[in-house]
């Protein structure tokens, strides 16, 4: 599985002590405020990944363990639906990473 930072540098190590799960979503170019807040303003559609260290897995069991996902998922990216993404991203922009930009 390929995970990338804004600079497209591959993430080699994930600190499991700081991260209990992750989510991925797609941001449309019309979401200008959110794109600006995560440093992606001016992009087309982009996939983004959120490394979640909020302990949500303990609260509602909705997160998957990163190590398990990386071992079991062979696709270039994992698509999860996370309807609270926008609110979460605006408060935790340091946890949002661009994975893939999709040309229109």
Language model regions located:
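Active-site and NAD+-binding cores of ADP-ribose-processing enzymes
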Residues: 2-21, 25-28, 38-104
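Compact nucleic-acid interaction/catalytic patches
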Residues: 34-36
């Amino acid at each position: 599985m390929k995970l990338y930072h804004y600079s497209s540098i591959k993430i080699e190590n994930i600190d499991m002590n700081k991260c209990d799960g992750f989510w991925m979503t797609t941001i449309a170019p019309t979401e200008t405020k959110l794109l600006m807040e995560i440093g992606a303003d001016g992009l087309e559609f982009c996939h983004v990944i959120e490394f979640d260290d909020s302990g949500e897995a303990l609260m509602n069991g909705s997160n998957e363990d990163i190590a398990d996902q990386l071992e079991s998922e062979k696709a270039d990216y994992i698509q999860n639906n996370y309807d609270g993404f926008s609110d979460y991203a605006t408060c935790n922009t340091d946890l949002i990473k661009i994975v893939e930009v999709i040309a229109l």
